[in-house]
């Protein structure tokens, strides 16, 4: 067997095993993903504003983080457009897209 084939086969086996874990345990996978997102979000301006460090459960999240509209995060987007980091998510976005703004004008997402 050709060496790259061995690597690809081993990697495919690894991915298959990982996929089976979340397929067979979807609630555990969702909980781990939730915890990772909250952990990473703690480092951001948005996460600090909504006290992500206190969030342990989905109910904590629901009671701490409001449902928002674009206008609510517009100040955060402005900071990102100025080049600031760790605003809505750790680091900086690769790029911002300009929407057509069908209901209320142009927006950056």
Indicate where each model-derived feature is located:
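Nucleotide 5′-phosphate-binding alpha/beta core
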Residues: 1-98, 104-109
């Amino acid at each position: 067997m050709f060496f790259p084939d061995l690597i690809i086969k081993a990697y495919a086996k690894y991915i298959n095993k990982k996929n089976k874990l979340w397929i067979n345990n979807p609630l555990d996978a969702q909980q781990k993903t939730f915890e990772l997102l909250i952990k990473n979000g703690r480092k951001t301006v948005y996460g600090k504003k909504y006290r992500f460090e206190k969030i342990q459960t989905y109910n904590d999240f629901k009671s701490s983080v409001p449902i928002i509209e674009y206008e609510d995060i517009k100040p955060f987007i402005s900071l990102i457009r100025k080049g600031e980091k760790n605003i809505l998510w750790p680091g900086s976005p690769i790029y911002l897209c300009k929407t057509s703004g069908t209901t209320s004008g142009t927006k950056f997402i």
